[in-house]
């Protein structure tokens, strides 16, 4: 077999994802690293739950991105995409949830949110530690004001049906525009305020 000549990303596919209302979802977790040496990582209690807009079907065509992927940019124009109310009121049918809404959903379904978020924190920490030598090396070479700099990360985590967490993507300096909806604005505004 020949290797493709164009750029590609190879990523493990979670075959039995945890579903909510039949939809695949991920959790955007925000972290802040304020020191590479010694390592200092902060987890923010804000974040987003982002849903695929099509019902999950493991046999769906792999090119049906609205079934398999939860990325906002790929789902926002789908007719099934549901924004929260202008006043910020959230509903189960929305395509994005806040962490507090997600926690209430978990509790109402007899799922322990504390245990789940410990699992998420565990895999996020491992992912950041896995890349830390590269981050520390870059930081030492490129950052002249090491004691006054920081880096924000947005990590996308998916859960399987057994509540095991997997980091699917790590984003450096994730988008903070918050212009899509009230939920984005509220979460990202608070996040940026806390960073400063």
Where on the chain are the PLM-derived regions?
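Glycine-rich phosphate/pyrophosphate-binding beta-alpha loops
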Residues: 171-179
């Amino acid at each position: 077999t020949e290797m493709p000549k164009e750029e590609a990303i190879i990523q493990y596919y979670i075959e039995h994802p945890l579903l909510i209302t039949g939809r695949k979802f991920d959790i955007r977790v925000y972290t802040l690293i304020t020191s590479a040496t010694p390592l200092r990582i902060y987890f923010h209690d804000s974040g987003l739950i982002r849903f695929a807009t099509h019902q999950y079907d493991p046999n769906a065509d792999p090119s049906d991105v609205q079934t398999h992927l939860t990325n906002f940019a790929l789902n926002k124009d789908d007719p099934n995409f549901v924004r929260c109310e202008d006043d910020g009121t959230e509903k189960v049918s929305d395509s994005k949830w806040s962490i507090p809404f997600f926690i209430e959903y978990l509790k109402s379904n007899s799922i322990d949110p504390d245990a789940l978020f410990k699992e998420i924190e565990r895999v996020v920490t491992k992912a950041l530690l896995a890349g830390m030598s590269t981050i520390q090396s870059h930081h030492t070479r490129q950052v002249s004001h090491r004691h006054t700099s920081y880096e924000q990360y947005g990590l996308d985590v998916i859960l399987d049906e057994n509540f095991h967490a997997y980091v699917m993507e790590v984003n450096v300096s994730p988008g903070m525009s918050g212009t899509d909806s009230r939920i984005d604005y509220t979460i990202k505004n608070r996040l940026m305020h806390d960073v400063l």
